[in-house]
């Protein structure tokens, strides 16, 4: 397993290697105001969209077909269409099956970070080497403008209280992942008029935590979301 062959973490790898995402995680524990997971058509290719949800078994069949058709796949990831850790059974079963069948492949997950921490030991055992955490704010007053609600256990939490819980858990997750030798990338979506002047603060906080890569992503207008009126950043 060559960890340098992850195209999302190494720009040079983009020229030679590809990745495949397995859509085994339909549920999400957060409602982001920029997100609408219901939209799906042949012309829609944004992250978080899939034409079907696969069971772990179906994902393995699909993966075999992908490997048979493409000889340059170095990474198998789980990124949704919901959050992997709002679907922990499906996520971990799929990762375990992939690791057993393809011991040399790079495994990664992308998450909002709300429920990662209880599963870090299992991720390390399965040799999941890369985790991406989306952190859009490190100030709950700003986070409250980005998230409608989050589900914490059986409770739905909103506004600054919810944003504060999310931030605390994201920071805890990043620290735990780094302590286990897992590479961490932090994604931040630049939302005009919401957090665009806050991104530098987020970047500094991520650097303090030892994040390996910080990735700024310009907002893409998403029909049906609460932020559908926002324009793309300049």
Q: For each of these PLM feature ranges, what is it?
A:
Residues 1-16, 196, 200-234:
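Auxiliary Fe-S-binding modules of radical SAM enzymes
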Residues 46-51, 147-150, 159-160, 228-232:
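Short glycine-enriched, charge-decorated loop/helix-capping segments at active-site entrances
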Residues 23, 77, 185, 189:
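Conserved beta-strand segments that form the floor/walls of ligand-binding pockets within enzyme
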Residues 57-79:
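Short Fe-S-cluster ligation motifs
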Residues 28, 32-35:
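Short cysteine clusters
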Residues 25, 48-56, 191-196:
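Active-site mouth loops of central-metabolism enzymes
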